[in-house]
Swiss-Prot record:
GO terms for cellular component: plasma membrane. NCBIfam families: PRK06638.1-1. It comes from Buchnera aphidicola subsp. Acyrthosiphon pisum (strain APS) (Acyrthosiphon pisum symbiotic bacterium). The chain crosses the membrane at residues 1-21, 30-50, 56-76, 94-114, 138-158. This is NADH-quinone oxidoreductase subunit J. Belongs to the complex I subunit 6 family. The lineage of its organism: Bacteria, Pseudomonadati, Pseudomonadota, Gammaproteobacteria, Enterobacterales. One of its GO terms (molecular function) is quinone binding. NDH-1 shuttles electrons from NADH, via FMN and iron-sulfur (Fe-S) centers, to quinones in the respiratory chain. Couples the redox reaction to proton translocation (for every two electrons transferred, four hydrogen ions are translocated across the cytoplasmic membrane), and thus conserves the redox energy in a proton gradient.
Length: 170
């Protein structure tokens, strides 16, 4: 399982690097999905199945959908060429395809050849996570939820302003 851990870690670092350097938001989202899935692979290889499942369901599912909605609300199609035909070019899909293929090969290797092997650790279930989140860290959880909600309201406000001078700097 160490091999799968290192492969997923490498894919996470590379895809996160591409998230940072991409100018186009849609390209960045594709690399972010690969980054989140590779981090879930790291969790699965460490035996933290609950954390890996949460990574896939919450982050790679719900948060990415939220980011897509934000991109749609901001209406950045004038600044960047966001035509669908532009995304079908092979140049766009080479990097994500290679990283996804690396993740797929490492996961199939882990499923078929490393059935009983894992990195030592203990199983964390949802009860332990809930007790820790809403026990001593309840203030931090509530604070982060308020921060995320306020960021969503600000982005919605910026995206829906109609009479904004494009040369005006905020």
């Amino acid at each position: 399982m160490e091999f799968v851990f290192y492969v997923c870690s490498f894919a996470a670092v590379v895809s996160t690097f591409f998230v940072i350097i991409q100018k186009n938001a849609v390209y960045s989202l594709v690399y972010l999905i690969i980054s989140l899935l590779s981090i879930a692979g790291v969790f699965f290889s460490l035996g933290a199945f609950f954390a890996g499942s949460l990574e896939v369901i919450i982050y790679a599912g719900a948060i990415i959908v939220l980011f897509v909605f934000v991109i749609m609300m901001l209406n950045i199609s004038d600044k960047y060429n966001l035509e669908e035909a532009h995304y079908l070019k092979p140049r766009f899909w080479i990097g994500p395809s290679i990283l996804s293929l690396i993740l797929l090969l490492s996961m199939t290797y882990a499923i078929f050849f490393l059935r009983d092997k894992k990195i030592d650790g203990f199983l964390i279930d949802s009860k332990i996570v809930g007790i820790n989140l809403f026990g001593p860290y309840v203030f931090l959880v509530e604070l982060s939820s308020i921060l995320l909600l306020s960021a969503l309201v600000v982005i919605f406000h910026i995206g829906t302003e109609k009479n904004v001078d494009k040369n005006k700097v905020l």
